[in-house]
Amino acid sequence: MTASNKQAVKAYLLNLQDKICQVLAAVDGKETFVEDSWQRPEGGGGRSRVLTNGAVIEKGGVNFSHVHGSSMPASATAHRPELAGRSFEAMGVSLVIHPNNPHVPTSHANVRFFIAEKEGAEPVWWFGGGYDLTPYYGNDEDCRHWHNTAKAACAPFGEDKYPRYKKWCDEYFYLKHRDEPRGVGGLFFDDLNELGFDQSFAFMQAVGDSYTQAYVPIVERRKDEPYNQAQRDFQLYRRGRYVEFNLVYDRGTLFGLQTGGRTESILMSLPPLVRWEYDWQPQPNTPEARLYEHYLQPQDWAE
């Protein structure tokens, strides 16, 4: 592991942020991403980019961060005790897109690299990331396209990768207190170093590069579908699950808050509007009920 390895990862991530913002701003057609560069007093910094009140995107955030510190936070050493006493660097791109139209799913993507070093010891490093889709009014065509794109990105790295990381995604994006998944899943991987640096880095790039290929065709298909206030209300209600997951379970959110990260960037993923209703239940035989009965049931979408 050399300094040039770390520089290559950082250069890729900065370029990925640029590319994703360009593509999504073009899809929106009205607003652009506004950048907020920031520095972290304890070490590092980042570029937060947010698009709000667009024609298609109600709120979208695409964040790059590169932070470093002299010791690991509790959230990281809890399941990796060998990291205690090491300095660390973490860099990544993380994004969440909340569309206006309830027929367009929310999407989340993240790719990241982590390294912990100590004098006289081999560095501990890994890649992580993935992407997942959260529909409000599900569509089989969209789910198949999303998962087929994910499967194709994984294919060059072995037949085991897609089913393994698809299953991990289903398990990770799960709200235990609701006993339901957050959406229809996608990919989730973490602690990836078994392929060696070059191939592990290549895999992370394949995932990062395929996100817009997975998401943009779905947005284009659904962004002009008509909707009513009741459907908008259901979208806002379901966004509540997004908030619950991010604040209760999400590793990245917890890591960021525990390391004294930049709160505005960490909470950038939260939707601008959301609603909770006491003991709400969908009416039988409605599209809302179908979300629970069909789409929030893990299944094999890829062909």
UniProtKB/Swiss-Prot annotation:
InterPro entries: Coprogen_oxidase_aer, Coprogen_oxidase_aer_sf, Coprogen_oxidase_CS
Active site: 108
GO cellular component, one term: cytoplasm
The entry's keywords: Cytoplasm, Heme biosynthesis, Metal-binding, Oxidoreductase, Porphyrin biosynthesis
EC numbers: 1.3.3.3
Annotated spans, Important for dimerization: 242-277
Family per record: Belongs to the aerobic coproporphyrinogen-III oxidase family.
Purpose: Involved in the heme biosynthesis. Catalyzes the aerobic oxidative decarboxylation of propionate groups of rings A and B of coproporphyrinogen-III to yield the vinyl groups in protoporphyrinogen-IX.
Complex formation: Homodimer.
Protein name stated in the entry: Oxygen-dependent coproporphyrinogen-III oxidase
Lineage: Bacteria, Pseudomonadati, Pseudomonadota, Gammaproteobacteria, Cellvibrionales
